[in-house]
Design a protein with these regions (language model features):
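Residue-level signature of outer-membrane beta-barrel architecture
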Residues: 6-7, 56-60, 114, 128, ...
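Surface-exposed extracellular loop regions of Gram-negative outer-membrane beta-barrel proteins
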Residues: 25-27, 83-85, 132, 152-195, ...
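Extended non-membrane alpha-helical scaffolds
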Residues: 196, 201-205
């Protein structure tokens, strides 16, 4: 849940602030029984997290062709997690990931929209993130150019750099060789260059078609040394190995959108 406050400094300047919170509680227990129905625990997981999220943005219309938006998002994450896993059947549980505390993810951005003329418009800006858990940070430029050829058709080209942090359990993985030390605590953000083309066509007053081919180049992806494991193809709900930001990846495809407004 959350609450939102809006304050108009004047007809061209708006400050919008939102405070929200989320809570998650996950428990998982897996037990194997032998022929005599003697139990042998395989997995014991307890994970609780609370996020408090404060977002604020200042929207300003400079003139009919230029607007600017500056924003800040502060996410305070409280976590308490403990994952124990038996390496083999009938062996005792070992701690895989354990953490109890809090950390912050701070995001800020500044973006502008400029109507160059009646047919060309440009959006550009800069986004930044800081994870206080390990003081990793990133700066991400983004821009898009749109050409409105006529009242029905438009083309656009967009580029953006994006990054993401991992799930909290990844940072607190512990191994037998490192004891109580969290081996992934200093992981950097996973990053990506995103390039997209767009074709939009207004079929009728209430119907429109949009075709958007895109390609994504990912880098600094957390992977396990001398292994094919990557967080990009993670199919388990836990990670139990030390990771390094040495992976790369690529995504590409085409999005089709058919939109019809209901009267």
């Amino acid at each position: 849940g959350g609450v939102t406050h809006r304050y108009f400094f004047n007809e061209n300047t708006l400050l919008k602030t939102t405070l929200a919170g989320t809570y998650s509680d996950q428990e998982a227990i897996q037990t194997t029984y032998d022929r005599e129905f003697n139990p042998s625990p395989n997995i014991d997981q307890n994970s609780r997290s609370t996020n408090l999220i404060l977002t604020s943005s200042l929207n300003r219309k400079v003139n009919n062709r230029f607007t600017n938006k500056t924003g800040l998002t502060f996410t305070q994450m409280f976590y308490n997690m403990n994952l124990e896993l038996a390496p083999f059947i009938d062996q005792p549980l070992e701690t895989i990931s354990k953490g109890d505390g809090n950390t912050s993810l701070i995001s800020a951005y500044n973006s502008s929209a400029w109507g160059i003329n009646d047919k060309l418009s440009l959006n550009f800006g800069l986004h930044g993130q800081l994870l206080t858990l390990n003081n990793r940070w990133t700066l991400e430029p983004r821009a898009s150019l749109k050409w409105q050829t006529n009242t029905r058709t438009s083309f656009a080209l967009a580029y953006g750099m994006y990054s993401r942090m991992e799930k909290m359990d990844v940072y607190f993985v512990k191994t037998q060789s490192t004891g109580d030390r969290s081996v992934n605590k200093n992981l950097d953000f996973t990053k990506a260059h995103h390039l997209m083309l767009s074709f939009a066509y207004k079929v009728s007053e209430n119907t429109s078609l949009k075709v958007e081919p895109y390609i994504q180049f990912l880098y600094d992806v957390p992977v396990m040394r001398d292994s094919s494991f990557s967080v990009l193809n993670r199919d388990e709900f836990f990670v139990e190995n030390a990771l390094v930001n040495k992976g790369r990846g690529r995504n590409f495809g085409v999005d089709f959108t058919w939109e019809r407004a209901l009267n």
